Amino acid sequence: MLFAVIGHPIEHSLSPLLHKISFELMKVEAEYVKVDVPPHRLGDFMSSVDMIFNGINVTIPHKVEVLKYVDVADDLVNEVGAANTLKIKDGKIYAFNTDVEGVRGSIKDAVDPKGLKVAVLGAGGAARAAVVALRDEAQVTVFNRTLEKAKRLAEELGVDYAGLNEVDKIKKHDIIINATPVGMDGVSMPIPPDVIESRHVLMDMVYRPLYTPFLKVGLAKGAKTVNGLKMLVIQGMESEKVWLGASPYWRDVYERLLASLA
Protein backbone atom coordinates (compact mmCIF):
# COMPACT_ATOMS: atom_id res chain seq x y z
CA MET A 1 0.00 0.00 0.00
CA LEU A 2 1.13 3.52 -0.75
CA PHE A 3 0.11 6.70 1.06
CA ALA A 4 1.24 10.33 0.73
CA VAL A 5 0.99 13.82 2.12
CA ILE A 6 0.64 16.63 -0.41
CA GLY A 7 1.23 20.34 0.11
CA HIS A 8 3.45 23.25 -0.90
CA PRO A 9 5.98 23.60 0.63
CA ILE A 10 6.17 20.10 2.08
CA GLU A 11 9.80 19.44 3.04
CA HIS A 12 9.14 20.27 6.73
CA SER A 13 6.39 17.63 7.09
CA LEU A 14 6.76 15.05 9.86
CA SER A 15 3.87 12.96 8.51
CA PRO A 16 6.10 10.34 6.78
CA LEU A 17 7.99 9.71 10.03
CA LEU A 18 4.76 9.65 12.05
CA HIS A 19 3.12 7.05 9.78
CA LYS A 20 6.31 5.00 9.49
CA ILE A 21 6.28 4.63 13.29
CA SER A 22 2.58 3.76 13.26
CA PHE A 23 2.82 1.22 10.42
CA GLU A 24 5.71 -0.49 12.23
CA LEU A 25 3.66 -0.70 15.46
CA MET A 26 0.76 -2.27 13.54
CA LYS A 27 3.06 -4.46 11.41
CA VAL A 28 1.42 -3.04 8.29
CA GLU A 29 3.39 -3.22 5.05
CA ALA A 30 2.94 0.26 3.63
CA GLU A 31 4.93 3.25 2.46
CA TYR A 32 4.19 6.90 3.10
CA VAL A 33 5.82 9.65 1.03
CA LYS A 34 5.64 13.44 0.79
CA VAL A 35 4.84 15.06 -2.55
CA ASP A 36 5.37 18.76 -3.22
CA VAL A 37 2.38 19.86 -5.29
CA PRO A 38 2.32 23.57 -6.21
CA PRO A 39 -1.21 25.02 -6.50
CA HIS A 40 -1.15 25.14 -10.31
CA ARG A 41 -0.30 21.40 -10.43
CA LEU A 42 -3.06 20.17 -8.10
CA GLY A 43 -5.50 19.27 -10.90
CA ASP A 44 -2.88 17.28 -12.80
CA PHE A 45 -1.83 15.46 -9.64
CA MET A 46 -5.39 14.58 -8.62
CA SER A 47 -6.23 13.24 -12.09
CA SER A 48 -4.00 10.20 -11.56
CA VAL A 49 -4.11 9.52 -7.80
CA ASP A 50 -6.57 6.63 -8.10
CA MET A 51 -3.96 4.64 -10.04
CA ILE A 52 -1.14 5.26 -7.55
CA PHE A 53 -2.26 5.86 -3.96
CA ASN A 54 -4.48 4.16 -1.38
CA GLY A 55 -4.80 7.30 0.71
CA ILE A 56 -3.58 10.89 0.92
CA ASN A 57 -3.19 13.51 3.61
CA VAL A 58 -3.72 17.07 2.40
CA THR A 59 -2.02 20.07 3.97
CA ILE A 60 -1.56 23.78 3.21
CA PRO A 61 -2.52 25.21 0.72
CA HIS A 62 -4.79 22.49 -0.74
CA LYS A 63 -7.34 21.62 1.98
CA VAL A 64 -10.15 23.62 0.37
CA GLU A 65 -9.15 23.48 -3.30
CA VAL A 66 -8.86 19.67 -3.24
CA LEU A 67 -12.63 19.39 -2.76
CA LYS A 68 -13.08 20.16 -6.47
CA TYR A 69 -11.52 16.80 -7.28
CA VAL A 70 -13.26 14.42 -4.84
CA ASP A 71 -16.25 12.20 -5.55
CA VAL A 72 -17.71 11.98 -2.04
CA ALA A 73 -17.22 14.32 0.95
CA ASP A 74 -18.38 13.35 4.44
CA ASP A 75 -20.56 15.61 6.60
CA LEU A 76 -17.66 16.99 8.62
CA VAL A 77 -15.84 18.06 5.44
CA ASN A 78 -18.95 19.97 4.36
CA GLU A 79 -19.24 21.55 7.82
CA VAL A 80 -15.60 22.67 7.98
CA GLY A 81 -15.32 23.36 4.25
CA ALA A 82 -11.96 21.59 4.07
CA ALA A 83 -10.51 18.08 3.83
CA ASN A 84 -7.19 16.78 5.11
CA THR A 85 -7.69 13.06 4.40
CA LEU A 86 -8.55 11.29 1.16
CA LYS A 87 -9.35 7.61 0.75
CA ILE A 88 -9.10 6.11 -2.72
CA LYS A 89 -11.22 3.03 -3.29
CA ASP A 90 -12.57 1.44 -6.49
CA GLY A 91 -11.51 4.47 -8.53
CA LYS A 92 -13.40 6.92 -6.31
CA ILE A 93 -11.93 9.61 -4.04
CA TYR A 94 -13.56 10.04 -0.63
CA ALA A 95 -12.80 13.14 1.49
CA PHE A 96 -12.65 13.32 5.29
CA ASN A 97 -11.56 15.84 7.92
CA THR A 98 -9.56 14.46 10.85
CA ASP A 99 -8.19 17.86 11.93
CA VAL A 100 -11.36 18.38 13.99
CA GLU A 101 -10.67 15.28 16.09
CA GLY A 102 -7.01 16.33 16.24
CA VAL A 103 -8.01 19.56 17.99
CA ARG A 104 -10.67 17.97 20.18
CA GLY A 105 -8.46 15.09 21.30
CA SER A 106 -5.51 17.39 22.04
CA ILE A 107 -7.56 19.76 24.18
CA LYS A 108 -9.35 16.96 26.03
CA ASP A 109 -5.98 15.44 26.91
CA ALA A 110 -5.30 18.65 28.90
CA VAL A 111 -8.73 19.78 30.13
CA ASP A 112 -12.46 19.09 29.81
CA PRO A 113 -13.64 21.99 27.62
CA LYS A 114 -17.30 21.67 28.61
CA GLY A 115 -18.67 25.09 29.55
CA LEU A 116 -15.30 26.82 29.19
CA LYS A 117 -14.58 29.94 27.15
CA VAL A 118 -12.32 29.30 24.15
CA ALA A 119 -10.46 31.98 22.18
CA VAL A 120 -9.46 30.85 18.68
CA LEU A 121 -6.78 33.11 17.18
CA GLY A 122 -7.06 33.24 13.39
CA ALA A 123 -9.82 32.75 10.83
CA GLY A 124 -8.31 30.37 8.26
CA GLY A 125 -8.66 26.63 7.73
CA ALA A 126 -7.01 25.67 11.03
CA ALA A 127 -9.32 28.04 12.91
CA ARG A 128 -12.38 26.50 11.22
CA ALA A 129 -11.36 23.04 12.44
CA ALA A 130 -10.82 24.36 15.98
CA VAL A 131 -14.22 26.08 16.06
CA VAL A 132 -16.10 23.01 14.79
CA ALA A 133 -14.19 20.80 17.26
CA LEU A 134 -15.23 22.77 20.34
CA ARG A 135 -18.33 24.85 19.63
CA ASP A 136 -20.81 22.20 20.85
CA GLU A 137 -19.26 21.98 24.32
CA ALA A 138 -17.60 25.36 24.90
CA GLN A 139 -18.24 29.07 24.30
CA VAL A 140 -16.04 29.88 21.30
CA THR A 141 -14.91 33.31 20.09
CA VAL A 142 -12.87 33.84 16.92
CA PHE A 143 -10.23 36.60 17.17
CA ASN A 144 -8.63 37.80 13.94
CA ARG A 145 -6.60 40.76 12.76
CA THR A 146 -9.01 41.28 9.83
CA LEU A 147 -12.35 41.69 11.60
CA GLU A 148 -14.44 41.07 8.47
CA LYS A 149 -12.87 37.62 8.04
CA ALA A 150 -13.55 36.77 11.70
CA LYS A 151 -17.15 37.94 11.28
CA ARG A 152 -17.72 35.75 8.21
CA LEU A 153 -16.32 32.65 9.89
CA ALA A 154 -18.12 33.26 13.19
CA GLU A 155 -21.50 33.91 11.58
CA GLU A 156 -21.18 30.85 9.35
CA LEU A 157 -20.30 28.56 12.26
CA GLY A 158 -22.52 30.18 14.89
CA VAL A 159 -19.93 31.55 17.32
CA ASP A 160 -18.76 34.99 18.51
CA TYR A 161 -15.97 37.11 17.04
CA ALA A 162 -13.70 40.03 17.93
CA GLY A 163 -10.51 41.74 16.78
CA LEU A 164 -7.13 40.23 17.62
CA ASN A 165 -6.22 43.57 19.21
CA GLU A 166 -8.96 43.14 21.84
CA VAL A 167 -6.51 41.57 24.28
CA ASP A 168 -8.60 42.18 27.40
CA LYS A 169 -11.32 40.00 25.89
CA ILE A 170 -8.82 37.26 25.00
CA LYS A 171 -7.48 37.28 28.58
CA LYS A 172 -10.96 36.46 29.95
CA HIS A 173 -11.02 33.10 28.14
CA ASP A 174 -9.99 29.78 29.68
CA ILE A 175 -8.47 28.16 26.58
CA ILE A 176 -6.48 30.07 23.95
CA ILE A 177 -5.75 28.31 20.65
CA ASN A 178 -3.25 29.72 18.18
CA ALA A 179 -4.62 28.77 14.75
CA THR A 180 -2.30 31.15 12.87
CA PRO A 181 1.21 30.44 11.50
CA VAL A 182 2.65 33.05 13.89
CA GLY A 183 5.44 31.43 15.88
CA MET A 184 6.82 29.19 13.15
CA ASP A 185 9.81 31.54 13.02
CA GLY A 186 10.58 30.76 16.67
CA VAL A 187 10.36 34.45 17.55
CA SER A 188 6.88 35.89 16.96
CA MET A 189 3.80 35.68 19.19
CA PRO A 190 0.14 35.99 18.12
CA ILE A 191 -0.73 37.95 21.29
CA PRO A 192 1.30 40.00 23.80
CA PRO A 193 2.96 37.89 26.56
CA ASP A 194 1.15 39.74 29.34
CA VAL A 195 -2.22 38.40 28.13
CA ILE A 196 -1.20 34.89 29.24
CA GLU A 197 -1.91 33.81 32.83
CA SER A 198 -1.22 30.64 34.82
CA ARG A 199 -4.91 29.63 34.73
CA HIS A 200 -4.95 29.46 30.92
CA VAL A 201 -4.73 26.34 28.77
CA LEU A 202 -2.73 27.20 25.64
CA MET A 203 -2.75 25.19 22.43
CA ASP A 204 -0.59 25.93 19.41
CA MET A 205 -1.48 24.30 16.09
CA VAL A 206 2.06 25.05 14.87
CA TYR A 207 4.27 22.00 15.53
CA ARG A 208 7.63 23.31 14.38
CA PRO A 209 9.16 24.51 16.63
CA LEU A 210 7.67 22.09 19.14
CA TYR A 211 7.54 24.86 21.74
CA THR A 212 6.71 28.17 20.10
CA PRO A 213 7.25 31.49 21.92
CA PHE A 214 3.48 31.41 22.71
CA LEU A 215 3.84 28.07 24.52
CA LYS A 216 7.17 29.00 26.14
CA VAL A 217 5.60 32.04 27.79
CA GLY A 218 2.75 29.84 28.99
CA LEU A 219 5.15 27.30 30.48
CA ALA A 220 7.11 30.06 32.22
CA LYS A 221 3.87 31.34 33.79
CA GLY A 222 2.69 27.88 34.86
CA ALA A 223 -0.09 27.54 32.29
CA LYS A 224 -1.05 24.17 30.79
CA THR A 225 0.25 23.85 27.23
CA VAL A 226 -0.66 21.64 24.28
CA ASN A 227 1.81 21.50 21.39
CA GLY A 228 0.89 21.07 17.73
CA LEU A 229 2.67 17.73 17.48
CA LYS A 230 -0.02 16.12 19.61
CA MET A 231 -2.69 17.32 17.19
CA LEU A 232 -0.62 16.08 14.23
CA VAL A 233 -0.41 12.60 15.74
CA ILE A 234 -4.09 12.38 16.72
CA GLN A 235 -5.32 13.51 13.29
CA GLY A 236 -2.82 11.10 11.70
CA MET A 237 -4.20 8.17 13.69
CA GLU A 238 -7.73 9.18 12.68
CA SER A 239 -6.57 9.18 9.04
CA GLU A 240 -5.26 5.63 9.47
CA LYS A 241 -8.65 4.55 10.83
CA VAL A 242 -10.17 5.91 7.60
CA TRP A 243 -7.64 4.06 5.42
CA LEU A 244 -7.04 0.85 7.36
CA GLY A 245 -9.94 0.56 9.80
CA ALA A 246 -7.52 0.71 12.74
CA SER A 247 -4.59 2.62 14.22
CA PRO A 248 -2.31 2.36 17.27
CA TYR A 249 -3.06 4.33 20.44
CA TRP A 250 -1.99 7.87 19.59
CA ARG A 251 0.13 8.33 22.72
CA ASP A 252 2.35 5.36 21.79
CA VAL A 253 3.09 6.98 18.42
CA TYR A 254 3.47 10.44 19.98
CA GLU A 255 6.08 9.28 22.50
CA ARG A 256 8.09 7.45 19.84
CA LEU A 257 7.91 10.47 17.52
CA LEU A 258 9.07 12.79 20.32
CA ALA A 259 11.99 10.46 21.08
CA SER A 260 13.03 10.35 17.42
CA LEU A 261 13.06 14.17 17.27
CA ALA A 262 15.12 14.58 20.46
Swiss-Prot record:
Taxonomic classification: Archaea, Thermoproteota, Thermoprotei, Desulfurococcales, Desulfurococcaceae
Alphabetical UniProt keywords: Amino-acid biosynthesis, Aromatic amino acid biosynthesis, NADP, Oxidoreductase
A GO molecular-function descriptor: shikimate 3-dehydrogenase (NADP+) activity
Encoding gene, per UniProt annotation: aroE
Organism whose genome encodes this protein: Ignicoccus hospitalis (strain KIN4/I / DSM 18386 / JCM 14125)
Pathway this chain belongs to: Metabolic intermediate biosynthesis; chorismate biosynthesis; chorismate from D-erythrose 4-phosphate and phosphoenolpyruvate: step 4/7
InterPro entries given in the database record: Aminoacid_DH-like_N_sf, NAD(P)-bd_dom_sf, Shikimate_DH, Shikimate_DH-bd_N, Shikimate_DH_fam, Shikm_DH/Glu-tRNA_Rdtase
UniProt-annotated catalytic positions: 63
UniProt-listed NCBIfam families: aroE
Protein name: Shikimate dehydrogenase (NADP(+))
HAMAP family for the chain: Shikimate_DH_AroE
